[in-house]
Swiss-Prot record:
SUPFAM superfamilies: Alpha-L RNA-binding motif (SSF55174), Pseudouridine synthase (SSF55120). This is Uncharacterized RNA pseudouridine synthase ML1370. It comes from Mycobacterium leprae (strain TN). Disulfide bonds: none annotated. Pfam families: PseudoU_synth_2, S4.
Length: 256
């Protein structure tokens, strides 16, 4: 790692002090940001920076703290939506069916073009991420980054003890093998079982097809997590901005 001590590294019109950038991005207070710089935990364009007087143009340079990219562009939008059951994941629908675009149009200003991360079937409820950060969206959706997704599924029948192991080993589906990374029984009532499962792929209807292949058709399905972002107590139809820490964790998961 190259280390620099030149406070004149950027004299551009948009250059501001590095600690101010970190503070504005919500990384730390101004004083705590200064400590991060002195400790050698901050990089600018791949170079370690330790001088507090360093000025950087956040629109040009890439700033990282502990190897994780700092998001400083105020025009970028990061949203979490709990898509209701019966709603389509598209931004528009030529047949007039209810879709995610209907919610976005009413609640997001500025006509921003948003990318979906993690589309869901109309009959599945749960977490969808929406952002105009194209690079992050692309990486989150690309199979090579293996971003985990967690679901709660209500299935027919009583689930036997060995089902989790069976799903972890994997089953052969029409489009190839599939397996879960984690599986647990959450609750059970006569004739039905609530299970939680985590997997890192996003093939169409993969959870429903996998559980059906195992002999347990899905009655209801909710996605609760995508990577570091959780649905929590967010109700169907509710839209919220991601926390800065959630954004940082997503960046870390995909190597940005």
């Amino acid at each position: 790692m190259v280390e620099i001590h030149d406070s004149r590294m950027d004299r551009g019109a948009g250059a501001v002090r590095l600690q101010k950038i970190l503070s504005r991005a919500g990384i730390a207070s101004r004083r705590a940001a200064e400590k991060l710089i002195i400790e050698g935990r901050v990089e600018v364009d791949g170079q370690l920076v330790r001088e507090l007087g360093t000025r950087v143009d956040p629109d040009v340079s890439v700033v990282r703290v502990d190897g994780v990219k700092v998001v400083v562009d105020d025009s970028l939008v990061y949203l979490a939506l709990n898509k209701p059951r019966g709603m389509y994941s598209t931004m528009s629908d030529d047949r007039g069916r209810p879709c995610v675009g209907d919610l976005i149009e009413r609640r997001v200003r500025g006509n921003k073009k948003l990318f979906h991360v993690g589309r869901l079937d109309a009959d599945t409820e749960g977490l969808i991420l929406l952002t105009n950060d194209g690079e992050l969206a692309h990486r989150l959706m690309h199979p090579s980054h293996e971003v985990s997704k967690t679901y709660l599924a209500t299935v027919k029948g009583a689930v036997p003890r060995g089902l989790g192991k069976k799903l972890s080993v994997g089953l052969e589906l029409d489009d190839g093998p599939a397996h879960v990374d984690d599986f647990a029984v959450v609750d059970a009532i006569p004739g039905k079982t609530l299970v939680r499962l985590t997997l890192h792929e996003g093939r169409k209807r993969i959870v429903r097809r996998l559980l059906t292949a195992a002999g347990f058709p899905v009655e209801m399905l909710v996605r609760t997590d995508i990577g570091a972002v959780s649905l929590g107590d967010q109700r169907p139809g509710c839209l919220r901005a991601l926390l800065r820490d959630e954004i940082r964790q997503l960046y870390k998961e995909v190597g940005l």
